[in-house]
Amino acid sequence: MTADESALTRPLVYAHRGASADFAEHTRAAYLRALADGADGVECDVHLTRDQQVVLLHDSNLDRTSDGTGPVAERTVDQLRLLDFSSWKGVRIPEAYGPRSEQFLTLPDLLDMLRAAGRDIGLAIELKHPSPYQLKLEDRVLEVLRAEGWDAETSRLGNIRVTFMSFSPDSVRHLSLIHI
């Protein structure tokens, strides 16, 4: 148990894929609403694109949550940014949460939003498998976090507390063996 965890006086509440009951999951609007609602943390699912960018999507295919089709791994981040990831939910996005064209997020985009929250916030990153890039996903997530200033000893990036999760035993072992 960390010092942060032992000092808790109440349960922490995490918004799964952002405020996904209100807005399309993993979108700028969903995460901004979760922060506005007072979530103690947010959960995101990550995949790698063809150009090795870490993007926030639950499914490995684009069909359910965008106007695109096919595997996420076969697209570049620039190609994904051209797709509509919010209309499928059928909800109008308030102006303050940005236009539809800015709803798709990369991990660095989410980190910027969480830093701007101005308070301590948790981030639970789920590494999605199977991935055609196998454990390169874990390596790229760690590279992105380190480039942003993440401290592996405390698992903090400024005001952001970072945790990892995965259904993949290989992912869990890989993260444990490299001592993050």
List PLM regions with ranges.
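Phosphate-group recognition and catalysis centered on beta-loop-alpha active-site segments
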Residues: M1-I178
